[in-house]
Amino acid sequence: MEKPSRNTYIPLTIVGECPECREYHRGRECPECGQDLRRPRLRPQFGGRGPHTLFYLEKYDWDTMKAVRRIAQALRKHHRHFGIAGMKDKRAVTSQRVTVRGVPPGVLARLRIRDLKIVPMGRARRKLRPGDLWGNRFVITVRGAKVRRLPEALRTVRELGGVPNYYGLQRFGSRRPVTHVVGKYVVLEDWEKAVKTFLTLEYPRESPEALEARRWLKEHWGEFKEALRRFPKFLDYERHILEHLARHPHDYINAFRRLPMWIRRMFVHAYQSYLFNRILSERIARGLPVHRPVEGDVTQDGLPTVPLPGFRTELSDGPQGEIEREVLEEEGVRLEDFEIKSMPELSAGGDRKPALLRVYGLRAEAIGDDTVRFTFSLPRGGYATTVLRELLGSEGVYAD
C-alpha cells in the first residue's frame, strides 16, 4: 500500500485557508463568476419557522465533527440533533451553516467556546444534509510560492475550465494519512491488520507522545493493557479500541466496532478515494484527456468519469476500462469485496465522479515577491489543495 498519490500534496505554507469559506445558500449566483448556485437551494425549508435553529459556525483548529460534539456537550444535546452540509478543514479559518434541533437561538448566542464563533441565523423546518451544499468559496494566501509558472498554469486551468479532480490529502488524514490503508484491510475483512494499522502505523508529523506509544505497541503487539496505560489521553479513539482489547485480546472485529460509525465508514471511503486517485493519475499518464470523453468512457454532464469502486460498480470500456481493471488487480481487491459481509453497515456500492474539477471565478493576486492570494469557488466535494497543486506544482511534500 502506497501513500496517497503525490498529486494530493503541496509544498507550501498556507497562511489562511477559507477565511470566508461560505456555502452559497444566500444568493442566486456566485458574486465571483455568476454561476447559478440554486441547485439545491435552502428555501423553503430554511427560514421562517421550524423545530431546528440554523446557525453560522466559524472555527479554527477544530475538526468539524469534534466542534459539533463540543457544542452538543455544552448544550447537553446528542450530536445526532445537529445537521451539517459538509466537512471543513481543521487547519484553517472556516465558516459553515449548522442546524440543531430544539435549542432556542438565544441559548446558542450565549455559548462561548474557544476558537469557535456561533451566530444564530433563524429557524429551519429540517436539519441540514450534505446535499444542501452547492460548494465553497476559498480565499487562500500562500507564502513561499514559486510564481514563475503561475501565468501559464492559470491560462491552462481557465482553458480547461478546471483541474484534475483528485481527492486532497485531507481525505486521507493531513497529519497521519493512514485512513486509506486501514480502509483496504476493512474491505478485505482483515480486522487484525485494520486495528493494528490504526493503532501502530507511525507518521513523523504526530506528537512525540503519540509516536512513542505507537512504536511501543508495534514492538509489543498483544500487550494491550500496558498499551492502554501508555497511549496519551488525547488519542481517544485509539483508547476506545485498546479498552476493548484489554478485556478481549483477540476480538479485533468488535474492538473496531468501538469506533463511531462515521469513522468506520470514513476508512472505506478513503480507500475508494485512493483508488480513484490512482486511476485518475494513470489516465493522465497515458495521455487521456480529463476535460472530454474518449471511446468507452462513462460520462456525467459531458465529462469523463472515474469510479469510486464498489460492489455495484460497472467498469468503463475502452482504455479507461483497462486502467480501472489493472489498478484493481494491482491492489489485489475485487469489486465484490466492497460488500463487507462481516460488517455489512460499511459496505459500499460505489459511485463515479468527473475526472475534471470545475473551478469558478479563479483569481490570483501577487502580494510581494513570493506571496500569492488566490480566490476561487468549487462545487461540493472539490479540494482547494488540488487546485493549488496544479497552479503551483508539487514535490510531494506535506503542507504545513
UniProtKB/Swiss-Prot annotation:
GO terms for molecular function: RNA binding; tRNA pseudouridine(13) synthase activity. NCBIfam families: tRNA_TruD_broad (TIGR00094). It catalyses: uridine(13) in tRNA = pseudouridine(13) in tRNA. PROSITE patterns: TRUD (PS50984), UPF0024 (PS01268). The active site is at D89 (nucleophile). This is Probable tRNA pseudouridine synthase D. GO terms for biological process: tRNA pseudouridine synthesis. It holds the Pfam family TruD. It comes from Methanopyrus kandleri (strain AV19 / DSM 6324 / JCM 9639 / NBRC 100938). Its EC number is 5.4.99.27. Belongs to the pseudouridine synthase TruD family. Gene3D superfamilies: TruD, catalytic domain. HAMAP family: TruD. The gene is truD. It is an enzyme of class 5 (isomerase). Residues 162-357 form the TRUD domain. It comes from the Archaea. Could be responsible for synthesis of pseudouridine from uracil-13 in transfer RNAs. Keywords: Isomerase, tRNA processing.
